[in-house]
Amino acid sequence: MSDKKISRLRRAKKTRYKIRELGVDRLSINRTPRHIYAQIISADGSKVLATASTLDKDLRAGATGNVEAAGKVGAMIAERAKAAGITKVAFDRSGFKYHGRVKALADAARENGLEF
């Protein structure tokens, strides 16, 4: 593994530990060059409560690796969280910079009613 990836995983591990101490559900994201994925995971980490990604049928037809697609995923995860009765989460950016697609997903989720 490259040093860059090792550093990202170290940051992610530290963040997840802090979120676990808070005892709230977390909005975890994963980013690849082609897709972006979002999951809401229960406070104890045992269940995935809601998911959304650019692989969903609604988004698969268009561009999937850009800021616009990430915004749509953010809106979709917020809607699915509301349907599951979740309004407040902790944002787990998985060690990625809060910039570009990560920021677009977070902003769209906030605009659609998810609090973090």
Swiss-Prot record:
A cellular component annotation (GO) from this entry: cytosolic large ribosomal subunit
Keyword Iron-sulfur part of the UniProt annotation: no
InterPro entries xrefs: Ribosomal_uL18_bac-type, Ribosomal_uL18_bac/euk
Top-level taxonomic group: Bacteria
GO biological process: translation
Gene Ontology molecular function, alphabetical: 5S rRNA binding; structural constituent of ribosome
Keywords: Ribonucleoprotein, Ribosomal protein, RNA-binding, rRNA-binding
Coiled-coil stretches noted in the UniProt entry, renumbered to this chain: none
Disulfide feature: none
Entries under NCBIfam families matching the protein: L18_bact
Similarity section: Belongs to the universal ribosomal protein uL18 family.
Subunit-level organization: Part of the 50S ribosomal subunit; part of the 5S rRNA/L5/L18/L25 subcomplex. Contacts the 5S and 23S rRNAs.
PANTHER family on file: 39S RIBOSOMAL PROTEIN L18, MITOCHONDRIAL, LARGE RIBOSOMAL SUBUNIT PROTEIN UL18M
Function text: This is one of the proteins that bind and probably mediate the attachment of the 5S RNA into the large ribosomal subunit, where it forms part of the central protuberance.
UniProt-recorded name of the protein: Large ribosomal subunit protein uL18
Source organism per UniProt: Hahella chejuensis (strain KCTC 2396)
Taxonomic classification: Bacteria, Pseudomonadati, Pseudomonadota, Gammaproteobacteria, Oceanospirillales
Annotated gene: rplR
